[in-house]
């Protein structure tokens, strides 16, 4: 099987990444990665992303301790989107929820908050 890393299609230097819990398949979050983040994710076994708001590379959990250990990386049929299947430590969401998708379009919160965000980032 060929390594698809060289053929990934980045838009403005970024590729979308969907993140799922490897056991439950719950969607945990969505983020972007640049080539360096994808390379670091593959070499370290832990999820790395590129923050558009901070304009920098980041390792998920570097401040909170809520790491994402990579179980598998899948590539979509167009090679322009990645799916990380992970073992999540702690919360995936910086708001203290297991998933960033914790509310409906109507604003109803459908997941319990696991941690107070102030506690997550006061380490």
Swiss-Prot record:
Record's catalysed reaction(s): 1-(5-phospho-beta-D-ribosyl)-5'-AMP + H2O = 1-(5-phospho-beta-D-ribosyl)-5-[(5-phospho-beta-D-ribosylamino)methylideneamino]imidazole-4-carboxamide
SUPFAM superfamilies according to UniProt: HisI-like (SSF141734)
GO BP annotations listed: L-histidine biosynthetic process
UniProt pathway: Amino-acid biosynthesis; L-histidine biosynthesis; L-histidine from 5-phospho-alpha-D-ribose 1-diphosphate: step 3/9
Residues engaged in binding Zn(2+): 77, 93, 100
Residues annotated to bind Mg(2+): 76, 78, 80
Pfam family, one: PRA-CH
GO molecular function: magnesium ion binding; phosphoribosyl-AMP cyclohydrolase activity; zinc ion binding
Protein EC: 3.5.4.19
Primary localization class, coarse: cytoplasm
GO CC, alphabetical: cytoplasm
The family this protein is said to belong to: Belongs to the PRA-CH family.
Oligomeric and partner information: Homodimer.
Described purpose of this protein according to its UniProt entry: Catalyzes the hydrolysis of the adenine ring of phosphoribosyl-AMP.
Name the UniProt record assigns to this protein: Phosphoribosyl-AMP cyclohydrolase
Native species: Methanocorpusculum labreanum (strain ATCC 43576 / DSM 4855 / Z)
């Amino acid at each position: 099987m060929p390594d698809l890393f060289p053929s990934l299609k980045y838009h403005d230097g970024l590729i979308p990444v969907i993140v799922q819990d490897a056991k439950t398949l719950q969607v945990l979050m969505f983020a972007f990665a640049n080539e360096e983040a994808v390379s670091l994710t593959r070499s370290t076994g832990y999820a790395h992303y590129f923050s558009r708001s901070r304009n920098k590379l980041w390792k998920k959990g570097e401040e909170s301790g809520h790491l994402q250990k990579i179980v598998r990386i899948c590539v979509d049929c167009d090679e322009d989107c990645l799916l990380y299947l992970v073992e999540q430590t702690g919360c995936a969401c910086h708001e203290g929820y297991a998933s960033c998708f914790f509310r409906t379009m109507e604003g109803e919160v459908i997941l319990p908050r696991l941690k107070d965000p102030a506690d997550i980032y006061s380490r």
